[in-house]
């Protein structure tokens, strides 16, 4: 039996640390967008460098778009693209499955 090449490529994205969580996080934000500082605050254990690298990766895959808003001061937000939102929609059933079947192994509690 051959493995689906599309699924294999998708797991190259989702199999990398933080990518799925960032996509899921943005999908739950107003307008599917957030400031870097909000993501850093809410994704508590990610370092600023790792977050920056992950957002760049996701932008290269056209899942996230960096938008610069010309205000004073200038604001930068990260927004899920249509492609990113479609992937986030596919992750929601996985999240529901995890809430039913995955046991948390540390001090985290479900939100």
Q: Where is each model-derived feature located?
A:
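Beta-hairpin "wing" of winged helix-turn-helix
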Residues: 59-79
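Basic, amphipathic "hinge/linker" alpha-helix immediately C-terminal to the N-terminal HTH DNA-binding motif
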Residues: 72-93
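Generic structural signal for secondary-structure transition and capping sites
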Residues: 19, 31, 63, 96-99, ...
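Short, hydrophobic secondary-structure boundary micro-motifs
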Residues: 35, 67, 106-107
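Amphipathic alpha-helical dimerization/coiled-coil segments
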Residues: 4, 89-111
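Basic amphipathic alpha-helical segments that dock to polyanions
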Residues: 51, 55-58
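N-terminal helix-turn-helix DNA-binding core of bacterial DNA-binding proteins
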Residues: 5-50, 77
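Residues on one face of amphipathic alpha-helical coiled coils
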Residues: 38, 57, 86, 93-96
